[in-house]
Amino acid sequence: MLKSGAIGEIVDVNASVTTLTDEQSEKMDSARFGGSMSENACFPLLPIFKLLGTDYRDVTFYSKMGNGVDLYTKAVFRYDKAVASFQVGLGAKTEGNLVISGTKGYAYVPAPWWKTDYFEIRYEDQNLNKKYFYPFAGEGLRYEIKDFISSVLQGTFQKLSRREIVRMTDVQDCYLKGETVYRI
């Protein structure tokens, strides 16, 4: 639906997955899980890669650190004709929605976007706005997100491609190596 031009050309995708986690949690242990990026980055990468593809030009990270892990990280991707960003946090909270901006309108998926059963297509003229309801099938956050994005794009269910998986690991690797990571 979105790739067919319902919101025009996609120029931006923004997704967030955050939770406030106890500082004593094993998720906050740098030796075990490594913080927000290690715990949650794969989830917001799914809609970004499904909508814009895996051939981004570069990525920059901004992280708030604490106890040796990232409590919050914002990643910004630059594509040839679009940008994308995500926020992940174990020690900071955001709305948790997904917004896909286009040249004619935008798609809004309310928080928590990975569990939602509907999304909205919104335009400058609010009389044209539409809500679409989507019944989830199956279990597992990763599969729900993938199925949701696939159905929005094509009305079909597709598996995560090998290329998408490899590029997700490339993003994690870039972050873990400290490439283009700025501490805030």
Locate predicted features.
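Predominantly a Rossmann-like dinucleotide-binding segment in NAD(P)-dependent oxidoreductases
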Residues: M1-V59
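Short, hydrophobic secondary-structure boundary micro-motifs
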Residues: I10, V59-T60, K131, K159-S161, ...
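Short glycine/proline- and acidic residue-enriched helix-loop micro-motifs
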Residues: A31, L128-Y132
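Short polybasic amphipathic segments
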Residues: L98, T116-Q126
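Active-site loop of classical SDR/Rossmann-like NAD(P)-dependent oxidoreductases
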Residues: Y132-K146
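C-terminal helix-rich "cap/oligomerization" subdomain common to oxidoreductases
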Residues: D147-I184
